[in-house]
Amino acid sequence: TLFRSRHNFCYTSAVMREKTRKLDLKLSERFGKHPGVILWHISNEYGGNFRDASCHCEECQKAFRKWLKKKYKTLDALNHAWWSAFWSHTYTDWEQIHSPSPRGEDELHGLKLDWKRFVSEQLQDFCREEIRAVKTYSDLPVTTNMMMYFSPLDYDKWAEELDVISWDSYPSWHTKEDEVPIAVWAAFMHNQMRGFQKKPFLMMESTPSLVNWDEENNVKRPGMNYLSSMQAIALGSNSVLYFQWRKSRGSSEKFHGAVVDHDASEKNRVFQEVAWIGKDLEK
């Protein structure tokens, strides 16, 4: 199995699915009618184990071959569709097929595209099972937070499973000479989220100050968090939510922005701008 930065589990594993179902059932039974719960947030950034959302274990290899057999029926049909004879990649046995990875074939375009489709469908099915479990004792709406234009997952199909669309918005403000291209990109993403279901969505995550994954992470200039938040509202978001409430004391996201900084002060600019947005949204 090839693990990356997080989500170190197999979405095909029957054991993982059963354990997850039991946890979801307990949550549904305990909190499904609680007046303080208004929405089920399923998982967090499905597929967020970095770039390809993939697990490459033997269970996934078997499931992938089964998926391919259902789609193509015969190896001749698969070889023709992938045009695998080029560079002598013709398959003569289903067991010869493995997921594209640094440990094997990763230049066959048909293989890579079908693997992406398989991964998206497997994760969507995993999500579907979680939704079914939490709705056992509850009729609350469900969502899961999408990640911009995260290509490994087919969000158009995922939208069919969700009651509410939500996404994590992190425009790269102040990285270009002109803010307009970034603003246009952000507007496009908000419009896409609204377009999935033709109704308002939730901005599940945003940063009040800075991110932590670029080579240079710029703090939002005075007023930019306000402008960015109001842009989201104007384009269909029903929320301005932040990751994270308090800065982490360590590990990968210790420098990621938060409402409460390491100084735990209410007097700094970031906290004051968050409060400003909150007051205006109450009007």
Question: Model-derived features: where do they sit?
Answer:
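Carbohydrate-binding surfaces of carbohydrate-active enzymes
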Residues: T90, W94-I97, L162-D163, Y170-K283
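Polysaccharide-binding and catalytic clefts of secreted carbohydrate-active enzymes
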Residues: R4-V164, D168-T175, E179-F188
